[in-house]
């Protein structure tokens, strides 16, 4: 519930709807508990039409620096027009109904939602993008 609320509040704060987001940088810790709950929350808010990936496989879990690192990657996706793939993903859970990308791909990315869900329920979602 906390992840879903964080994403909805980020959209509301930015004056956007779910359809305005082109890419979601998932918190994506590669644990069953986190990935299943985050995947369900993303599906509830966005359905399965928004490209999603986790970039923690590139950097490892940087704890307190994870959020800013993922925000930088999100802005690079906007600047360079790509969706970063999730490295080291071996199989996808068919119960998680989102558009999860394992390969880098070119795309027009105007707005990104970046999730950071901390220990003990500290949930944050940040909307980043081009000024329109």
Q: Locations of the language-model features?
A:
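Conserved "HGTGT" condensation-loop signature of ketosynthase/thiolase-family condensing enzymes
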Residues: 1-132
């Amino acid at each position: 519930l906390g992840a879903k609320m964080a994403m909805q509040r980020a959209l509301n704060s930015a004056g956007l709807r779910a359809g305005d987001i082109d890419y979601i940088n998932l918190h994506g810790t590669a644990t069953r508990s986190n990935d299943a709950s985050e995947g369900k929350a993303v599906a509830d808010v966005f359905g399965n039409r928004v490209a999603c990936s986790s970039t923690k496989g590139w950097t490892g879990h940087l704890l307190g620096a994870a959020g800013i690192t993922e925000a930088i990657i999100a802005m690079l996706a906007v600047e360079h027009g790509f969706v970063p793939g999730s490295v080291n993903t071996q199989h996808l859970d068919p119960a998680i109904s989102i558009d999860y990308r394992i390969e880098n791909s070119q795309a027009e990315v105007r707005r990104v939602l970046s999730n950071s869900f901390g220990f003990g329920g500290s949930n944050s979602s940040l909307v980043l993008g081009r000024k329109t």
